[in-house]
């Protein structure tokens, strides 16, 4: 919660929309660089996949983790295994994502490594989430 409060304060101090977007992306890249190697490698690839496939999503920190927002609302996010003491990292979606599929659907995915198949699945899911 402290991380989120700091994010909100920093966001309020930023200047123009372009300056804010550049600063938020820089904060995401910096946070990714601080991660342990396995999480960092996955987070870097996810960041690249989202920027390549869904460029309308804006990177920003959300509770201290990389996330991607549309119109200021977080659609998807990455959680490092290290930060949460988990055995795997997580790529997940907020309730703003358009993933509804019947009465039940997955909202997060465990990641132990990022294969080309997983990258393709993430790209497809994120494209669908913002459609």
Label the predicted regions.
Residues 2-131:
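Charge-dense, helix-prone N-terminal extensions
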């Amino acid at each position: 919660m402290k991380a989120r409060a700091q994010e909100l304060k920093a966001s309020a101090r930023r200047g123009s929309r372009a300056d804010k977007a550049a600063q938020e992306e820089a904060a995401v890249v910096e946070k990714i660089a601080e991660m342990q190697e396995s999480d960092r490698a996955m987070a870097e690839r996810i960041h690249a996949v989202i920027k390549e496939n869904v460029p309308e999503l804006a990177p920003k920190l959300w509770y201290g983790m990389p996330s991607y927002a549309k119109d200021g609302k977080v659609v998807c996010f990455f959680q490092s295994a290290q930060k949460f003491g988990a055995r795997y990292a997580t790529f997940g979606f907020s309730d703003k994502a358009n993933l509804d599929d019947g009465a039940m659907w997955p909202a997060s995915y465990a990641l132990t490594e990022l294969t080309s198949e997983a990258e393709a699945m993430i790209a497809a899911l994120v494209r669908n989430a913002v459609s």
